[in-house]
Amino acid sequence: MHKMAQEVEDAVGIRLIHIADSTAPSIKDAGCKAPLLLATGYTMEQDFYKGHLRERHGIEARIPDADDRAEIHRIIYEELCRGEIWADSKETFLEVVRKETAKGADGVIFGCTEIGLLVKAEDFEVPSFDTTILHAQAALDYALES
C-alpha cells in the first residue's frame, strides 16, 4: 500500500499515514541520519520507503549488500511469516547490523512487521525503530486528535 500511498490517499479522500512519515520523527529524535533498513527484499530494493525518507525527511536509509538482503528476505518469508523463530537467523540479523554499522549506519529500521519477533531494541548498540509500533502509535495519535 505504501508504494502507492499518494494514489490511495487521493482516491479515498482521507489522510493516509505513510509508514515512513510515522518512523521519521523517531529517527530524527535519536539523531540518526543514515539508519539501516531491514525489510523484505522489495521494500529494501525499491524506492517507496527509502525515497520517501530521503525526499520528505532528509534521512538517507541504507540497505545491506545483495547477499544479506536475500538472506533477510528469506528469513522473513520462510521463517518469521510462518511463526518460526531460530537463533541462527537472529544471529544473521545481528551480524548484518554489525557489518552495516561498521560502514556508517547509525540506527536500524525494522521495516517489516515480523522483524520484531526475532530481534529487539536491546540487541543493538545503535537505536532501533520498530515501524509496526511507530505506525500504530501514529494512527492512535491521529484518531485521538480527530
Regions of interest found by a model, annotated:
Residues M1-S146:
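Non-catalytic structural scaffold of enzyme domains
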